[in-house]
Structure formats: C-alpha cells, structure tokens
Amino acid sequence: MSEGDAYEDFMMSEDEEMHYAEMEEDSDEMGVYEEETSQGAEEEVPLDPSSSIVEGRYYRAKGLKENSKFREAIEALEGVATSSEPLWAFRALKQIAKCWNFKGAQASEGYQDGVRTALVRLLEHGLRWRQKLGAAYVERSLISTLRMLVPANSQNFVFDEAHEICLPTIEFHLRLLDAVAPLPGDFKDLCTLHMQLRLENLIWRERLRGADCTAILSEAPAPQLTAETLLLLLQCHICRFLRLCQPPAQQFAELVSELQDRAERSLALAQQPHAMVLLAFAQCMRGMQQQPQPHSALRTHFSACLQGLEEIGSNSSFFRDLNLCGFVLADALAYSAGRCSHRVDPFALEQIRILRETPIVHNLQLLYESYVALDLPSFARALDLLAPFRSALAPLFARLCALARERKLWDAIAPLHSCIALADIQRLLCIGSSSLSRDSLLTLMMQGVMASSARVPFRLDLTRDYVYFGDEPRVQLRAPAARPGLRHCAHDLGLTSACARPFQGSSALQLMDCLSEHRNRAASAAADPADAVCRARQPLAAYRTLAALILDE
C-alpha cells in the first residue's frame, strides 16, 4: 500500500465510505433540482429505444417539479410510475416522494399520507425489480430518499435547547420509519440507517416528553455501533446526568473510551465539532466525580467545549452557559491549588470576552472576584444567581465553597485573631443560608493540621469553645466587670496576657511605644491587605484604654 492510500484510509472511516459513494454515484438523490445521473443503473439496465416516450414524459414532469408546480408534477409522474418501464417508474416514484416533501414544506394538506404512501410504493417497487434495476442502485436510492424524508437531527444536542424540533414531527418520522419496516436483511446499509434514525427519533420523543432517554436504550434493539450511534448513546447519558444529576453509569465510561479511540483513528471524526464537544464534556463529567478532582484537566476540557460550541455557532444556550460556568469554577479551583504564577485571567479569554456584557458573565465575575477577595456575603449572592447550574456542577460548587471557607479561616481569621469563640468563626464562615456546624468547623481545623494547610498554629479550649491562634499559649486579658467592652477591643488588636506581662512596672510612654511596634509588625505581616488597613484605622484612644487595662492587671 502506498503512502497516499494509507493517508486516504486514515482520512476516511468505514462509516463515511458509504456516504462518499452516495454523493459520487447517486448525485440525483442529493438535491431536488439536480439532474438524474444514476450511472450505476444505466450500466446494469440498458435502455430500450421503446422507452423514449416514457422518458420524455418523465422529464416533462420533472420540469414541472423544478418550477414548483408540485401538484401537476405528481399527476404527470403518476403516469410514468404506472408504466411498464421499471427504471423510469422507479425514478418517477423517487420524484413523487420529493414533490411531497416540498409540498410538506409548504404545509399542504395530506402531506403525511402522501409522503408515507410515496415511500412505501418506492420501497415495494425497488424490491420487486431489484434484480433488474440492480440491488446496489436500489439500496442507494432508498437510503438517499429516507435521509431526505427523515433528516437526522445531528445539528442539535439531545440535552440542549432545540426549539426547532417539535414532538409532532418526531412522531411522524417514527410512523414513517415503521411503515417501511421490516427491511430486507441483505440491504445492510439501509437497515443500519433505518435503525439509527429510529433510535434517534425515539430518543428525541422521550426527551421532548420529559422522560428518561436512557430507558429507550434497554427497550430498543441494540444498534450497530457506528460513529453516529455512538454519539447518540453518549448524548442520552449526558441528558440523564443533567436531568437527574446522578453519576454516570459504567456503560458511559465505555462509550467515552470508544469515542476517544475512534477520534484518534479517524481524522474526519476528530474534526467534527459536535463530536469533540461531546467527548470533552463527557471527560468533564468523569473528572468531576474523581477524588481528588483534576482541576487543570477540567479547565482544559471545559475550554475545549467552549471552543467547539463557538465553531458550531451556539451563541445562546443553556449548555454553553453551563460550560462557561464550569470553566470559571475549574479556573478558580486551580487558582486555589497554588498555580497563581501560571494563571491567565479567565475573563480575558476570547470566548468569554465577547460575552462580557451578558448576565452569565457578570454573575461569574462576581463569584470569582468575591472568592479571591474572601468576601463570603458577595460569594453567597453570586451562588444564588448561578442556581440553574448548581445541580449539574454540584461537585465543583461544593469544592469551591469548601475552599472558600478554608481560605477564609487560615488567610483572614487566624492571622487577625489571637482568641476567638468557635461560634464567631461559624458566623464568619457562613455562606448565605448554609451555615457551618461546630463539628464541621473542628473537622476543618484538624484537616488543616493534617494537610499542613493551617498557616497559623492554634490551641483549642473545648471547655469554653475558644480557639487561641499563635505560636505560644495565650490567655485572654481579664477586663474589669465595669468595662466588659475592653475585652473585645483587646482581642481585635491581638493583645493577650503574654503581651501584658512585660508591661508590668513600665511607664505609659514605654507601653505606648511597645504597643505601636507590635501593631506595626502585625500590620506588615498580614496576609490580606484589607486586614492591615482595618488595623491601621483603630483609633489611638483604644491604645490608651488598653494601657489602663494592662496597668490594672
């Protein structure tokens, strides 16, 4: 085999060879106004000179069809279809089916009955005369006619919005397919197409009815696993996942692996945006269920989905917004994993920048910015605005909320407080209506120690439910009963009994100098610049009050 032959085999999969042959040898079936060629039939069936009269009637009738005079064309073609010439009768029946198909586009009366009758007559005539007409020619003609009357919905995802697909049309297509069943087994390509179209329309019927699409897979006969069928089965599992938010079944993983293998072997399949979007989103579904979640890989897969949808031209759909949301969530999670130096602002990417004025991007920006700034109230508002996507992306949202609380605890609360009650930490870590229980907080703190993410040492006083942050044990300052508010002020400044002991016997001036130095060091070491600003705004009167408190000790 030469290098050219090998390259052609690589470029063309087995599933595509049949379609290529149809376009090359049976071009008369690919369009309504193209000339009849059917070279295969002419080679197999030499034309009889006596058929010239029938031939002339056929082309005159075809001219009427080309002038959109469908009713007159059907009447003229009926005369050819009932003639004693099998070839011209077969061609006339094909043209009648085309006429009815175009009359259907004009919403004419009797469209469904006319199409069904025309298709059944074409099939019966082809089977009766297939020996004389040539089985290959008959099968190609039936395949192209069936594709015309029952077009595939390959441009729409089963799980996404599809306003142009309606239930009555799907049900008519199923009746049309049932009318020509069963098909002869020796017409393998026709049988494969029939089974594939029937499965597709059954899936769409269940989807438009709001039922579970995967139930059809167990009821319908197992189809031949072509690339088109594989994509259909994969869409069923994705539809079920988005609808019920349940982890995909084992069969789903097998379908993903099969599609990935085929895409690696077939360049034509790998260049289909619909197929690659399905593959990338399926990998996102698998990644979200893994522990730990591969955030960088998820970010890559969601980005591939967005690029594929841009190629398809899906400018406004739930599925596009879902992938947009997943991409930003994965980027935020990767940010938390310490990859800040290698990050690219997600909102600077072209796919998102062109949508910057849309509500979904505004909501995602609020979520992202509040997460980075550890502003949990704003973070909670953003979560509420993204409620339509929280069930499908539940693992990512749950992980982001957990990381937001973890970062808030160790980056904002622990450096700022020397002693704080567990109840106060629970209040500070509340995200909207989702509160953190005492046991969950203690678990979070213990996990921080075990994972070395606890940036500040701490001690727990479980008798009084206090947490002491810092390198050395600290005890709260004792405030006189007449001045209970001083205790809170001391805690906000990080003053404890460990700070008070060196001040015993000191002058007020020395005390103020030590307090100022201690405060400046704390402000410069704060992890969050907002904390330093907050401390710097404490009034000088607080120092004087605390000085009196410490001297009283």
UniProtKB/Swiss-Prot annotation:
Localization (cell): Cytoplasm; Nucleus
Region (Disordered) residue spans: 21-47
GO cellular component: COP9 signalosome; cytoplasm
Keyword terms of this UniProt record: Cytoplasm, Nucleus, Signalosome
GO-annotated biological processes: protein deneddylation
Coiled coil regions, renumbered to chain: none
Major localisation: cytoplasm
Superkingdom assignment: Eukaryota
InterPro entries: 26S_Proteasome/COP9_Components, PCI_dom
Stretch forming the signal peptide: none
PCI domain location: 298-474
Disulfide bonds: none
Compositional bias ranges of the Acidic residues kind: 21-46
PANTHER family: 26S PROTEASOME NON-ATPASE REGULATORY SUBUNIT 11/COP9 SIGNALOSOME COMPLEX SUBUNIT 2 (PTHR10678)
Subunit structure as annotated in this protein's UniProt entry: Component of a COP9 signalosome-like (CSN) complex.
Physiological role: Component of the COP9 signalosome (CSN) complex that acts as an regulator of the ubiquitin (Ubl) conjugation pathway by mediating the deneddylation of the cullin subunit of SCF-type E3 ubiquitin-protein ligase complexes. The CSN complex is involved in the regulation of the mating pheromone response.
Name this protein carries in UniProt: COP9 signalosome complex subunit 10
Annotated organism of origin: Eremothecium gossypii (strain ATCC 10895 / CBS 109.51 / FGSC 9923 / NRRL Y-1056) (Yeast)
Lineage: Eukaryota, Fungi, Dikarya, Ascomycota, Saccharomycotina
Gene name linked to the record: RRI2
